[in-house]
Amino acid sequence: MAKIVSREIRLTSRPIGMPITANFSVVQTELKPLPDQQVLVRNLFMSVDPYMRGRMNEGKSYVPSFKIGQPLEGGAVGEVVESRAKEFKPGDVVTSNFGWREYFIAAPKDLHPVSREAQPLSLYLGALGMTGMTAWVGLLVGEVKAGDVVYISGAAGAVGNVAGQLAKLRGCRVIGSTGSMEKVNFLREECGFDIAFDYKVGPVAEQLKVEVPDGIDVYFDNVGGEALEAALSALRVHGRIIACGGISAYNDEKPQPGPSNLFNIITKRLTMKGLIVRDWLDRQGEFEKEVGGYFRAGKLKNKETVVIGIDHAVEAFLGLFQGNNVGKMVVKLA
């Protein structure tokens, strides 16, 4: 194995509130010779996702915190450069959780083979990857069925737009809220949402009353905060809440008070379920078959915001909290 020099992004300090570039550093490293039963991979694309913000904090959660001075982790799709394991050969395309770096060495068990058929290969980080699977699983968690009226917050994001498209394919009426008219048009014209509105124009609760005066059956929550409170008022009796994310509060220095109308859960007999996609990895093959089929048939669109180069990876991550992405935010590394 020839000498390989790689760059990686490390966490240098824990953010307080909104992360800043000084919390991160770009470090150049030289990879060690490739051991037996290991694989050398060059990353082509890496993912940046809002959930990563939680891993930058100390404290116990469903996934360990990032360590100070160590490279960050996250979804990536790459190409095998060299292999000393029988499971892979040079040229194979794989996904992994070793993002935030240009090259890495890993055991075969930590790599997931994928086909070159999907283009661009960053699809495996978006609609055909964990964000797409999160949307798909969310509809299972929410027991979404034909005829349901489904409201999705953060609807133009990576998970939200796929959730809306899948709900439409299931025969639902779909409403989405987002943060600009550009994104409203994207939801209506490209994703097929029945209704989309800009939450910045006026109170979400009031806009929902106008757009869906008879209420909603399902709320797919990517935001929390005002959107959750509005949904609790708009939900019909026996409505369901899919608790997927809460990006409105990820950078809060102090916890914010919860919705003032939680009592609606009792009076309306609502169901609220949390969602962590890794709990559903035994269904990944089923997801790939169904959603991959939709994509190949032209029934599912994939939208990306692409940032070029590892030097701009932190910028891409911070942009998630400023609404800079339409669809999935990815960083092209090679």
Indicate where each model-derived feature is located.
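Mid-domain Rossmann-like dinucleotide-binding core that forms the NAD(H)/NADP(H) cofactor-binding site
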Residues: 125-202
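Glycine-rich beta-strand-centered segment in the early N-terminal region that forms part
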Residues: 30-48, 56-100
